[in-house]
């Protein structure tokens, strides 16, 4: 379980004031000295993550955040980073001290984003009036806090139980291939080994898709683009589904048997991580782009650009081939994502294998709130190749 990608783990974030004991609580929850602890306020200057497992829930990711009461120029920057963590959060642990206006504001902020919140009153070992404070927090925040001591582990099991109770009903139910495949289906995977393919290994979407197909007891054949015809000829019957790299969508479409359905890894991840229906609807905004338009391309991972880079080279080339060279394209990566999306006519996101579903959906909602179309690499490439209505998802 330690090898479960962070993107597939339940994201549990701790929020609270500086020196409220968030870092000590992370250490208590993990049973390790994961985070530096100090009585000096503001020790945590950046979000810190720690992968762990909570039985019987499974793999989780704890996120320790800077205090939301930080001050000064640097303090404001730290608070901004804490705010960005909200978009990734599946369950929030909010450390309260009195239930005052600031803590109520953060509770409301989290609830408005649809995030289940567990209130905690930490440092029970050092407070003479713990019971009275807990009643005060319950009265002001509308729910009782769990009384906790990170020092002697009081309340840790209660936190585990509360996390299980607050687990989103649909968490972990989303699958990569959905209802597209069934036991015994023959599936062909087309995986070009170009400059973008890491030497000696497969990229994460391919690995996860193969694992899921094995779990579903499908029969898998894989090949590079130039060996697709040979692969198809080796089969007694056409495959039920062909999953390809989006970059060779058109090539594979021209060679596939009429009986075989076609999709791509990126398109599958559009539904696995995001909102496939909004992505498909938004892809038609490509037809409305002009040289005066502005497009944002967002990558989840950070890497040195390559000559055949799909996000930085191939998609911009396809777009400008259609609209003209004047089309303005901005590219961001990792957690960098503009707070103000209003200048953009279209957003094109990668498959987001490195992000959890909650984070991708929060970006989609940010765009949708401004009525800005947002699609992903695979869906956009399918539309640009004129085959969006001929693929499955």
Residue spans of the language-model regions?
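Conserved hydrophobic helix-helix packing surfaces used for dimerization/oligomerization
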Residues: 12, 187, 293-295
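Canonical P-loop GTPase G-domain recognition
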Residues: 113-118, 123-179, 186-188, 217-226, ...
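Long, well-ordered amphipathic alpha-helical subdomains in the mid-to-C-terminal portions
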Residues: 180-208
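C-terminal effector/interaction modules appended to NTPase cores
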Residues: 2, 17-23, 200-393
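G-domain G4 guanine-recognition motif of GTPases
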Residues: 65, 95-99, 115-132, 146-155, ...
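Conserved C-terminal guanine-recognition region of P-loop GTPase G domains, centered on the G4
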Residues: 50-58, 63, 73-145, 176-179, ...
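Conserved G1/Walker A P-loop phosphate-binding module
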Residues: 1-76, 80, 84-87
